[in-house]
Amino acid sequence: TVYKADRVVCSLPLPVMRYIKFDPYLPSVMAKGIALVPYFPMTQVHLVAKEPFWEADGWSPDMWTDTVAGHVIANRHNVDNTDVTSLTAWARGFTALQLDQVSPEEGKAWVISEFERIRPSAKGKLEAPQIKSWLRDPFANGDYAVWEPGQVTEFLYAVGQPHGNIHFCGEHT
């Protein structure tokens, strides 16, 4: 598909820009930065508690783990933001890559299994309606830029510069 416009504001992540043909070509330093800056793997598993198991064990529903459940955050999306409406397990880095090696259903089951192992009060009380791998998402290809040594100096300024009538923005600029 070809899109033409007088002006463009481009907020695409760098890995997504790797699949775009720019005409005229991007400056070499900018193109190199787009090609080389890696993005952080992250996978989220959205959990729903059938009942508030945290009341039984007296611990906060939020927790940090060294398992594929990663960092668990209680979401409070009700009218007064007091009741826990769902939980999100954030697997980052190596644990996200582990989850990405199995099917979505296996990944959800694995997170629940690990959650229940370290939090016995949750046994049989969790469902995982959704899993989201940001690395597998073709419109993201990761969570955020992870600048390697020397890349900030070499590429940060370049990837945020306008190119003709294309203006770049995003967390990497």
Predicted regions and their residues:
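Glycine-rich, flexible loop/turn motifs
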Residues: 16-18, 22, 33, 50, ...
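A conserved short coil-to-beta-strand element within the FAD-binding core of flavoproteins
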Residues: 1
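Flavin (primarily FAD) binding-site architecture
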Residues: 6-29, 43-46
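Central beta-strand plus flanking loop segment that forms part of the substrate or channel wall
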Residues: 29-58
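Conserved flavin/dinucleotide-binding core of flavoenzymes
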Residues: 11, 20, 41, 55-173
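Short coil/turn segments at beta-strand junctions that form active-site/ligand-binding loops
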Residues: 5-6, 164
